[in-house]
């Protein structure tokens, strides 16, 4: 049976399919973890420890050595995306309930969902698109994008916009696994290669654990909102990223469009933030479902828009 190939036909399928299976498990048997206990409970409820290992392994993949051009390109994209997410948080904070919109076409939409969907780029998708449409420097920009992994950037944005206050030790705790992995990966190339293999392996496991925090009714109710959020991510972050790539990064805008996606790992952000800032707990389930939808929408649309932008750039040069 070609289960893996079938699952991967869906954009982000290795994370989203286990997430849906987890949501199905939680809907049909909410007490499964506590009833089964032991290792089964660890798989069902172990979102944080599984993600901690994943962040460590992601940190190990970040190489310290990078050319000035690569740092310039990646820095302009990463900083622009973070700045846009912060601006969206500042503008929307007075307009949206902290627990999310309760009903209507924007059901579940909250500042937490917006920040989580906008501040983290799908690095794998970006690298693949740049290998096809960009240069080696463009593809190398994924180096700094790995720093967006985890809740740290979202914590900084929510804190800077006045929506939450986090104790200093929480920032340290959020980034420490990434830094430890980063240190080991740069001290020993063999360790970097060893830990890098686990980054893909762990994805379905944290997807399943995350799904076990959701009810299928939440996913159904936020379906339309999730599609709109995915489109909003591309529109709101895409144009600034395109301009930043041209004016700051020295590119033709193609890399900027390719970076206007939502990372699969962003699905974990609402639950992690809610664990540290309880005021976001009511918004977290809907935000998780919304971000999952945004991952699918951006994974489908961003490659198409990147191809169009690359074609326009070639015509302009020609």
Swiss-Prot record:
Q: Among its keywords, does the record have NAD?
A: no
Q: Which UniProt keywords apply?
A: Cell inner membrane, Cell membrane, Membrane, Sugar transport, Symport, Transmembrane, Transmembrane helix, Transport
Q: Which residues cross the membrane?
A: 10-30, 42-62, 82-102, 109-129, 139-159, 163-183, 201-221, 224-244, 257-277, 288-308
Q: State whether keyword Zinc applies.
A: no
Catalytic activity entry: 2-dehydro-3-deoxy-D-gluconate(in) + H(+)(in) = 2-dehydro-3-deoxy-D-gluconate(out) + H(+)(out)
Cite a single GO MF annotation: 2-keto-3-deoxygluconate:proton symporter activity
How is this protein positioned relative to the membrane?
Answer: Multi-pass membrane protein
The places in or outside the cell where this protein is found are: Cell inner membrane
Pfam families for the chain: KdgT
Tell me, in a sentence or two, what this protein's role is. Catalyzes the proton-dependent uptake of 2-keto-3-deoxygluconate (KDG) into the cell.
Name the protein family: Belongs to the KdgT transporter family.
Q: What is this protein called?
A: 2-keto-3-deoxygluconate permease
């Amino acid at each position: 049976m070609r289960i893996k190939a079938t699952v991967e036909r869906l954009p982000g399928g290795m994370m989203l399919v286990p997430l849906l299976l987890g949501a199905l498990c939680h809907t049909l048997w909410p007490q499964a973890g506590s009833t089964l206990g032991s290792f089964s409970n660890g798989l069902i409820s172990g979102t944080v420890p599984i993600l901690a290992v994943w962040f460590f392994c992601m940190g190990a993949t970040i190489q310290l050595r990078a050319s000035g051009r690569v740092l310039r390109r990646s820095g302009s994209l990463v900083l622009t995306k973070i700045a846009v997410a912060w601006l969206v948080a500042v503008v929307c904070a007075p307009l949206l309930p902290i627990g999310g919109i309760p009903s209507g076409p924007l059901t579940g939409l909250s500042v937490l969902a917006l920040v989580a969907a906008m501040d983290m780029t799908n690095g794998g998708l970006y690298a693949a698109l740049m290998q096809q449409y960009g240069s080696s420097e463009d593809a190398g920009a994924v180096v700094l994008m790995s720093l967006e992994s985890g809740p740290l950037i979202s914590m900084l944005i929510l804190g800077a916009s006045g929506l939450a206050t986090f104790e200093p030790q929480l920032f340290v705790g959020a980034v420490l696994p990434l830094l430890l992995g980063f240190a080991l990966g740069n001290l020993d190339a063999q360790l970097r290669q060893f830990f890098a293999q686990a980054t893909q392996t762990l994805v379905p496991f944290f997807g399943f654990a995350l799904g076990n925090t959701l009810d299928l009714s939440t996913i159904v109710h936020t379906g339309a909102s999730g599609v709109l959020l995915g489109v909003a991510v591309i529109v709101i972050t895409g144009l600034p990223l395109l301009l930043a790539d041209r004016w700051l990064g020295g590119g033709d805008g193609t890399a900027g469009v390719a970076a206007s996606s939502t990372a699969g790992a962003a699905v974990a952000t609402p639950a992690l933030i809610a664990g540290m800032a309880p005021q976001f707990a009511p918004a977290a389930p809907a935000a998780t479902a919304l971000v999952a939808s945004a991952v699918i929408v951006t994974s489908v649309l961003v490659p198409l828009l990147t191809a169009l932008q690359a074609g326009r750039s070639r015509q302009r040069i020609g």
